[in-house]
């Protein structure tokens, strides 16, 4: 039996009662901290004795709703303080203490850490305290203009009265919606600096900046700016990084996805490198289709030499990505697309391999192989396929389906074509070997992409993250000449046929917020997102003109979702079940219908996209009409064809504003990197998603694990304060230890629970239950 010394102690019973009743836990009598020998260096350089009451006040503020944890936070921070400490370092120690306590069992520490981190940002940026008085928007805009961070021409369109009205709409309380990691990511990544080390913006300024930039040219713009600000700051949806970083800046490049294609000539290869570097500089993620590039050993007419093949050029593009990183915020990124029948396909597949020398590797790029039904059937039949040099087989590029087969077999009959026969399964195994060893090699199915496209054009690649499928084509230099002007200056004039660099602007709906909305609120949110994203096409700066040509002609948007797993969890649906498939089908049917409807409404207001009559939209055909029938057959949900037919007629009659509307970007789902925090309820996400479908009965009837139903609701601590709960999921796997005290009470603790114990050397420390030994004296539970 372990001895217990009791002073200033809250028993588990008292603590539970306090939490259940919603009362704050009084820690005013905690032992005074050992402050006598600690000196604090303040921000202005002055020194003063450490005052534990100040730290206590901060910790109690951060632990609002979780006051019972403040004692632990203070004590665990105290032991880290040394004789002389900078106030910034001391504050950081409090934050680190809270962060280190975050776990699945104790998620409330994330709220505490987020509040502490937020207070640190307030102090460092504008010396704001717990009262949270944001600096005026007018002052932020002025400082941004003075430091050439903001575009003064855009800001000049807003009157002083409008800026005052927008300032009044800023709600600092929404800063508390962030998780700890989300706050750190957002502040470091999206809140702009005015010097290398000084932040210009706080989080709500960032959201307002984006809203002002995207809605500046709207009629009734203040109302629309506020609506967009509300949607962003309430985390109903999120914009992609280029929008969050570049909106309202002088170099306002807002596209996330940049798709390029090159020609098999030196001008195109080098011009493509320049274009990739420029877009990477402005935070775009890039992709490049190299299918036309001739293979190693191909003859070069202009120099009477022989090509070194794609590999050296991939190293060239890799160097560009390293040099032109995304504004210093993240590394440059490029995905290379190539055809399965390319003569050098095995060399390209090996470019990320851990083996080999640096001379024949380009490990900093991503790679995607373009497959089709012909090749897959050869794999199934275990037959041979023939690889070709694209220089000798130019007509094979941009062919799919029966056209590909006919052209391919025609080249098989020609004698003057460089080729190589391999087993289809040998190539297939190489693809999966590289995938397993490097985690890369995307697979792009040309026929699936082109058969379901709305654009009636060949699409030869996707983007960096393989969710956007839109066409691109290279510019061609048709003339280059010297011209002497009237004043004697000499100029070089180059003329190109206009190619297309396909651009797409992304946003993602937060499905957890979506779940809370009425149908009317959902439609209102979708209208706001479509309008805001569509405006990016017009307000954006285009550093490469091929991008402007494509974007203004087709006005591509990519609206997707985030927090999909959380959405299913909150609906009590296991992710890998038929029920999840049915729910997902219904969700995206509804979302797609609303997004297309919003784009039609915008077309009525502002006009259809210029390339409308080239596409399937003009025929009244919708994406659901071209969807993969096998995929649609995976669910039993009946489609409401009446509503889709009516919508198709509206599209045919009035047009649509955007040639493409949806794309599921690879957003984080309730991970530590996610900027947006969501409430997953009182259950662990992992436990909920992995459990079997069982009857919701009590533990007594199920055994070691299952749902435990309370006789009456109790208040339990969650990441948003105390909430009422009627049941709990018990997985039966948490190891515990029982401890009996001198008063006869026996308590059962999980092994990762901490108790304050006096160690054999007489010092006190918080010790995990698992680490307790018989020679320790428990001081506090």
Spans of features found by a protein language model:
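Extended catalytic cores of very large enzyme megasubunits
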Residues: 2-675, 707, 748, 778-781
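HINT superfamily self-processing domains
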Residues: 60, 669-781
């Amino acid at each position: 039996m372990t001895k217990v010394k009791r002073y200033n102690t809250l028993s588990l019973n008292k603590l539970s009662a306090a939490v259940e009743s919603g009362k704050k836990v009084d820690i005013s009598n905690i032992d005074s901290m050992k402050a006598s020998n600690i000196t604090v260096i303040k921000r202005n350089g002055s020194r003063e004795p450490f005052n534990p009451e100040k730290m206590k006040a901060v910790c109690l503020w951060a632990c609002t709703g979780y006051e019972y944890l403040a004692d632990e936070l203070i004590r665990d921070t105290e032991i880290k303080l040394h004789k002389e400490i900078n106030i910034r370092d001391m504050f950081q120690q409090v934050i680190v203490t809270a962060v280190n306590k975050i776990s699945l069992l104790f998620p409330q520490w994330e709220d505490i850490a987020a509040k502490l981190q937020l207070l640190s940002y307030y102090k460092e940026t504008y010396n704001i305290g717990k009262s949270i008085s944001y600096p005026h928007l007018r002052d932020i805009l002025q400082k941004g203009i003075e430091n050439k961070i903001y575009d003064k021409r855009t800001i000049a369109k807003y009157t002083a009265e409008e800026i005052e009205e927008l300032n009044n709409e800023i709600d600092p309380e929404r800063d508390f919606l962030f998780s700890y990691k989300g706050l750190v990511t957002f502040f470091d990544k999206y809140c702009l600096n005015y010097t290398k080390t000084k932040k210009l913006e706080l989080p709500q300024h960032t959201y307002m900046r984006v809203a002002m930039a995207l809605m500046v040219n709207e009629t009734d713009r203040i109302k629309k700016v506020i609506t967009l600000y509300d949607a962003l700051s309430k985390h109903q949806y999120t914009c992609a990084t280029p929008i969050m970083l570049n909106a309202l800046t002088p170099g306002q490049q807002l596209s996330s996805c940049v798709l390029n294609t090159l020609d098999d000539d030196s001008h195109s290869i080098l011009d493509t490198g320049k274009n990739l570097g420029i877009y990477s500089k402005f935070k775009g993620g890039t992709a490049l289709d190299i299918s036309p590039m001739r293979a190693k050993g191909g003859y070069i007419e202009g120099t009477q030499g022989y090509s070194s093949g794609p590999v050296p050029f991939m190293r060239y593009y890799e160097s560009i990505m390293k040099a032109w990183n995304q504004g210093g915020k993240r590394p440059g990124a490029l995905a290379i697309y190539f055809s399965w029948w390319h003569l050098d396909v095995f060399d390209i597949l090996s470019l990320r391999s851990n083996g080999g020398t640096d001379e024949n590797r380009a490990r900093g790029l991503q790679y995607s192989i373009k497959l089709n039904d012909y090749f897959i059937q050869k794999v199934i039949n275990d037959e041979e396929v023939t690889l070709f040099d694209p220089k000798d087989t130019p007509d094979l590029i941009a062919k799919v389906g029966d056209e590909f087969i006919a052209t391919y077999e025609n080249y098989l009959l020609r004698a003057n074509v460089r080729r190589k026969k391999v087993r289809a399964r040998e190539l297939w195994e190489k693809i999966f070997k590289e995938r397993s060893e490097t985690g890369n090699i995307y697979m792009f199915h040309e026929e699936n992409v082109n058969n379901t496209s709305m654009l009636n054009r060949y699409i030869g690649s996707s983007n960096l993250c393989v969710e956007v499928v839109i066409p691109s084509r290279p510019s061609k230099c048709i003339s280059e000449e010297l011209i002497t002007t009237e004043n004697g200056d000499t100029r070089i004039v180059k003329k190109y046929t206009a190619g297309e660099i396909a651009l797409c602007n992304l946003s993602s709906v937060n499905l957890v917020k979506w779940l809370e909305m009425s149908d009317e609120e959902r439609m209102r949110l979708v209208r706001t997102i479509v309008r805001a994203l569509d405006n990016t096409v017009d307000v954006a700066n285009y550093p490469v003109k091929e991008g402007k040509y494509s974007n203004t002609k087709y006005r591509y948007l990519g609206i997707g979702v985030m927090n999909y797993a959380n959405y299913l969890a909150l609906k009590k649906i296991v992710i890998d079940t038929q029920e999840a498939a049915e729910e997902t089908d219904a969700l995206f049917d509804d979302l797609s219908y609303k997004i297309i409807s919003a784009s039609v409404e915008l077309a009525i207001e502002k006009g259809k996209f210029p390339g409308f009559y080239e596409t399937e939209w003009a025929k009244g055909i919708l994406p659901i009409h071209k969807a993969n029938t096998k995929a649609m057959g995976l669910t039993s949900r009946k489609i409401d064809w009446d509503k889709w037919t009516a919508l198709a007629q509206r599209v045919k009659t009035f047009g649509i504003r955007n040639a493409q509307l949806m794309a599921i970007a690879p957003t984080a789902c309730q991970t530590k990197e996610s900027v947006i925090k969501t409430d997953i309820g009182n259950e662990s996400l992992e436990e909920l998603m992995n459990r079997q479908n069982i009857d919701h009965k009590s533990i007594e009837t199920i055994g070691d694990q299952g749902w435990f139903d309370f006789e009456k609701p109790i208040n339990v601590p969650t990441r948003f304060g105390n909430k009422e709960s009627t049941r709990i999921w018990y997985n039966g796997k948490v190891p515990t230890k029982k401890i009996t005290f001198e008063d006869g009470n026996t308590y059962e603790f999980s092994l990762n629970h901490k108790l304050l114990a006096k160690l054999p050397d007489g010092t006190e420390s918080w010790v995990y239950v698992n680490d307790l030994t018989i020679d320790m004296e428990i001081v506090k539970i």
